[in-house]
Amino acid sequence: MRAPGALLARMSRLLLLLLLKVSASSALGVAPASRNETCLGESCAPTVIQRRGRDAWGPGNSARDVLRARAPREEQGAAFLAGPSWDLPAAPGRDPAAGRGAEASAAGPPGPPTRPPGPWRWKGARGQEPSETLGRGNPTALQLFLQISEEEEKGPRGAGISGRSQEQSVKTVPGASDLFYWPRRAGKLQGSHHKPLSKTANGLAGHEGWTIALPGRALAQNGSLGEGIHEPGGPRRGNSTNRRVRLKNPFYPLTQESYGAYAVMCLSVVIFGTGIIGNLAVMCIVCHNYYMRSISNSLLANLAFWDFLIIFFCLPLVIFHELTKKWLLEDFSCKIVPYIEVASLGVTTFTLCALCIDRFRAATNVQMYYEMIENCSSTTAKLAVIWVGALLLALPEVVLRQLSKEDLGFSGRAPAERCIIKISPDLPDTIYVLALTYDSARLWWYFGCYFCLPTLFTITCSLVTARKIRKAEKACTRGNKRQIQLESQMNCTVVALTILYGFCIIPENICNIVTAYMATGVSQQTMDLLNIISQFLLFFKSCVTPVLLFCLCKPFSRAFMECCCCCCEECIQKSSTVTSDDNDNEYTTELELSPFSTIRREMSTFASVGTHC
C-alpha cells in the first residue's frame, strides 16, 4: 500500500495536466466538458475549469465567454451576406440581375451606411486597441483564436481575404471611416484586399473588380465609377463620355419640324453655292483684268469680298445653330458671327456711299471723256477708310453678346444655346459704361447708320447724278452718247444694289424694334422666326449682289463669260466674227470704267494691257 504522500503527489500531477489541457482546448475554441458536466479521464469538474479559465484569461475572457461572443458574430456575418443589394433594376427586356440598384437607390439610404457590419467593425476596432490589453510578449490565446476564426471564414464570401490585408485596407486608406462597400450581387462583395487600393479619377478602385465608392456615390451595375447612378435629390454624375449629351437630330424622325429642317438645309446649300461662285467671280474679274481695276470696280470687289466672308464663315455656323440649337464654336462663334455681320453692313453702307460719289463725279465729267486718274494708293486709302470705320463701329457687338443656355425639357438632350445681348459685369468700368451707352442707343444707331444713311444718301445722289446725265445728254455730240448711256446704266446698278440692301435689312430693324418695345407681348418662337428671317435675308443679299452685277453691268457679264469660256475655241471664234459696230460698242463699254485710258486710246494699246481669266 502506497503512502499518502505519494497519492497526493500523483493527484497534483493529474490536476496540472488537466489545467494545461483546458488551456489548450480553450485556445482552439473547443470545450472539454461533456453534456453531463462530469470530468472524463484526466479532466476535472466544470466548476474547476471555469474557475481556472477565469484565472488564466482574466475576468470575462474565459473560453465559454469567447464562444458566446463568437456566435453573434457569425450571425451578423450571415445577415450581412443576406442583406439587400444596391444594384440597378434590370431594364425591360434585359437581364433581371443587370440592375437592382435603382430600386435600392429609391428605397435604400441615400448615403453610405454609418458603420460597416459587425465583424468588420470589430476587426477595425481591434486594430486600434492598445497592445497591453491583449498581453505582452508571445501571442496570447485570444490572438490565436482570432487568427483561426479568420481562416475559417474564408469561403465563397471571403475567399482570399486575410485579416491582415483587410485591416490594412481600413487603416491605411485616408478617410477610411467614410468608405463603404456596395455589393453587386447578393452574397458577393465589391472589393479585393489582396493588393493596396489604387486611386482613380473618380474614387478609390481596388483590384480584381473590387471598387470602393466615395461617400454618397453609388456604383453602377458593372461596378465602375465612370457611370454614376443618379441618386434621389442629388446631382447627376457621370464620366466624360456620359457628359457628352446627345445633339438633336433635325432630320429624323420625320415630323413637321424635320421638314422645316430639310427646307432650311436646301435653301442654305443654294445660297452657299451661288454666293461663293458669284463673289469669287467678281473678285477674280477685277484682279485678273487690268482694264477693270477702276475705283468703282475696286469698291465692288471689296463688297464682294465681305459678301464672300459672310457666306463662307457665318452661314454654316448659323445653319448649324438653327438645326441643332447649339453653337459650333460656343462663345467664340456667338461673338464673332454678329460682329462680322454688323461689320459687313457697315462695309456695304460705306461702299454704296462711295459708289454714289464716284458716279456723281463721272456724270459731271462726261463731256471731258471721264477717266480715272486716281492711282493705287488713293484707292487703297479709300478702302482702308471703309474697313476701319466698319470694324470700329461693329466692335461693341463683341462686348454685348453673351451665350445663354436654356433647358429644352428633354432628358439626355443638350440645352438650347442662345446668343443674347447681355453686358458682362466683369468688364472694366470705362468699357462697361460705353457698352451701356451703346446698348441704350443701339436701336436708333442701327436704324440710322445701317439703313437710313445708305438708302437716303444713295437715292439723293442718284437723283442728282441722273439730272446731270440728262443735261449732258442734251448738250452732247454723237461721239460720246454711248458713254453717257453707260454712266446712266451704272447709276441704275448702284440704285438697284441700294434697294436690295434696304429690302434685306428691314427685318433686322423690325426685330430690334420688337425686342426693345414689344418683347413681353411676343413669344420666343416669333422672335426666333424673325431672327432666322433676318439672317437669311442678309445671306440672300450677299448671294444676289454678284448676280445683280452680272445682269445689269455689261463689263462684268462679258468678263465673266470670257473667264468661263476662255478655254473654249467656239467662244473665241464667235467673239472674233462680231461686226465692227459691235466691236466699237464693246470697246466703249469696256473702257467705261477703265483706269488711265480714254476713248481715243487705240485698240492695240488696250489689247496689250488687258488680260483675260
From Swiss-Prot:
Q: Where in the cell is it found?
A: Cell projection, Dendrite; Synapse; Cell membrane; Endoplasmic reticulum membrane
- Cellular component, GO, one term: endoplasmic reticulum
Q: What does the record say about its membrane topology? A: Multi-pass membrane protein
The SS bond pairs are 334-419
Q: Where is the composition biased (Low complexity)?
A: 89-108
Annotated site residue numbers, Cleavage: 54-55, 167-168
Which of the residues are on side Extracellular? 27-265, 321-335, 401-443, 515-531
Q: Which GO terms describe its biological process?
A: adenylate cyclase-inhibiting G protein-coupled receptor signaling pathway; cellular response to reactive oxygen species; dendrite development; dopamine biosynthetic process; G protein-coupled receptor signaling pathway; locomotion involved in locomotory behavior; neuropeptide signaling pathway; positive regulation of dopamine metabolic process
Cross-referenced Pfam families? 7tm_1
Query: Where in the sequence does glycosylation occur per the annotation?
Result: 36, 222, 239
Entry superkingdom: Eukaryota
Primary subcellular site in the record, as a coarse category: other
Matching InterPro entries: GPCR_Rhodpsn, GPCR_Rhodpsn_7TM, GPR37_orph
Q: Outline which residue ranges sit on the Cytoplasmic face.
A: 287-299, 357-379, 465-493, 553-613
Modification after translation, per record: The N-terminus is cleaved by ADAM10 metalloproteinase; mediating limited proteolysis leading to the release of receptor ectodomain by shedding. In addition, cleaved by FURIN between Arg-54 and Asp-55. Ubiquitinated by PRKN in the presence of UBE2E1 and UBE2L3 in the endoplasmic reticulum. The unfolded form is specifically ubiquitinated by SYVN1, which promotes its proteasomal degradation and prevents neuronal cell death.
Which UniProt key words apply to this protein?
Cell membrane, Cell projection, Disulfide bond, Endoplasmic reticulum, G-protein coupled receptor, Glycoprotein, Membrane, Receptor, Signal, Synapse, Transducer, Transmembrane, Transmembrane helix, Ubl conjugation
**Which GO molecular function terms does the record list?**
G protein-coupled peptide receptor activity; G protein-coupled receptor activity; heat shock protein binding; Hsp70 protein binding; neuropeptide binding; neuropeptide receptor activity; PDZ domain binding; peptide binding
Do you know which PANTHER family this protein is assigned to? PROSAPOSIN RECEPTOR GPR37, PROSAPOSIN RECEPTOR GPR37 FAMILY MEMBER
Q: What is the annotated quaternary arrangement, including any partners?
A: Forms a complex with PRKN, STUB1 and HSP70. The amount of STUB1 in the complex increases during ER stress. STUB1 promotes the dissociation of HSP70 from PRKN, thus facilitating PRKN-mediated GPR37 ubiquitination. Interacts with PACRG. Interacts with MPDZ. Interacts with CNTNAP2. Interacts with LRP6; this interaction promotes LRP6 maturation.
Record-given protein name: Prosaposin receptor GPR37
Lineage of the organism: Eukaryota, Metazoa, Chordata, Craniata, Vertebrata
